[in-house]
Each structure stands twice: as structure tokens, then as C-alpha cells.
């Protein structure tokens, strides 16, 4: 600023102005002679001054102006310094209290963390205990075939009749027929007219012919020759095998049933994964629901 004022007079609108003219044009602008220090010097307190300040802080944390002036006279410091010291001292006290609280919480937290694994173990054991009864009850159901589990049967079929009450329907496909274990896997289909009467079996039987196009997609381990030979059998031969063609209303042109020969044994594995059939050559897979 001083160098700016020491410049020679310059013309403003053709008038030669001096520094006094600048003061007249800008009377509100002050030009300090010495630059102001932006940072104050740190105040170093002596031991005696700190003792006096600590004694007053022990009495009250918020002294009024009169108390601050009195202490400032005692320790020979400005009152503003005393006010700033009390402000810093209160902040330091709050910080110490927070550290103590955090330290107490840190001491209590490990105990909670130690007790939490026990709770997790107990919760895991509780969940395992909750899940074990369904698994134990589901295996005997499949093994003993005490009750039908109609997950693959159509939803519109009425409840099973008495001859089919002991059949395991986990192997049922899209047609309403069940495999009975009592006959020693002979597949004696009970063709009762009371159960199959008035039903259109074509809607349930025809899709199976398209789903079993090749030898890889057949569910039974017998070959394709046996399949074609059984598909071309007459109703008389179907009735001799215990299928009840007369009561079911099947004719000789129905080529969508996957039957077996009496000489060929189609053994059913009633295990926990009896619904998981995976053929390498077909994409028709049953998954456990």
C-alpha cells in the first residue's frame, strides 16, 4: 500500500491529483502504516499462574467477567487470555470424560463379544434342532411309503383310493398312476373305475410320448426295443400284465405309456434323492422340491 501511495501523481479525467486528492476521493479507505500480524503469539503460563487458574476452575467452570478480571490482575495477564484459558480447559475436561467413557465401554464390550459366540452356537443348535425333524420324518416316508406324497401328480386329481394308500407317489409322473411296493415292483396298476372314471387320460398321457423321444430320456433302464414292443401291444396283453386296460379305457393305439415287461425288472430306489434323475443325453431332470 505504501508503494502505491508513493507513486507520482497521475491524471484522472485530465486532472492532476496528488495523494491528498486520493484521500478526498476515498475518505473511507484506511491505509495502515504497519501490516497487522495475522497470528497471535502463544501465551506461556507459569506454574504460579496455572495454580491460580486451576483453583478458580475447581470452583466454577464458567467464571463471570468480574472473576476473570480479578484473576487477570493477580497473574498479570490480560482478561482475554484468562477467558481463552478457561475455554480450552473446559474442552480438555470434556475430552477426558469422553476417553474415560470409551475406555469403560471397551472394557465391557469384550465380555459381550465372549457371550455372543455362545448365543450363536445355541442359535445354530436351535436351528439344526428345528431342521432335523423334517429330515428324519421325510426319509421314513420315502423308505416305508406309508403315505403318498403327490408332488408330481396333477392338482385336479381326487384323493387316492384305499388300494393306493400305501403307494409311494414320489415317482409319479404326469399321469395318475402309482407304483406299489407291495407287489414286489411288479407294477400292478390298480385300474379302478371309481378313481379313473370320467377322466380324460389323453391329456395326461400324451405329453409323455414327446418327453421320452429317445433311449436316453427313458426313466426305465430297459432298451428302446422293449419300449416299442410294449407300446404296440394289444389291450389283451395289457390286461394280462395287470394294467386293467378295459377299465382304464385305453385302446391299442395309445403309445404314450412307459410300461415294463414282466421279465424286465424296473427296480425303484426309494432313497432321499429318488427324485434326482440326471441323464447324460437328455435335459429332463427332476429336482427335489
Swiss-Prot record:
Gene3D superfamilies: Homeodomain-like (1.10.10.60). It is found in: Nucleus. The gene is Otx2. Belongs to the paired homeobox family. Bicoid subfamily. GO terms for cellular component: cytoplasm; nucleoplasm; nucleus; transcription regulator complex. Residues 38-97 bind DNA. The keyword Oxidoreductase does not apply. Its main location: nucleus. One of its GO terms (molecular function) is DNA-binding transcription factor activity, RNA polymerase II-specific. Transcription factor probably involved in the development of the brain and the sense organs. Can bind to the bicoid/BCD target sequence (BTS): 5'-TCTAATCCC-3'. Residues 123-132 have a biased composition (Polar residues). Keywords: Developmental protein, DNA-binding, Homeobox, Nucleus. It comes from the Eukaryota. One of its GO terms (biological process) is primitive streak formation. InterPro entries: HD (IPR001356), Homeobox_CS (IPR017970), Homeodomain-like_sf (IPR009057), Otx2_TF (IPR003022), Otx_TF (IPR003025), Otx_TF_C (IPR013851). This is Homeobox protein OTX2. Brain: restricted regions of the developing rostral brain including the presumptive cerebral cortex and olfactory bulbs; expressed in the developing olfactory, auricolar and ocular systems, including the covering of the optic nerve. Residues 95-106, 133-143 have a biased composition (Low complexity).
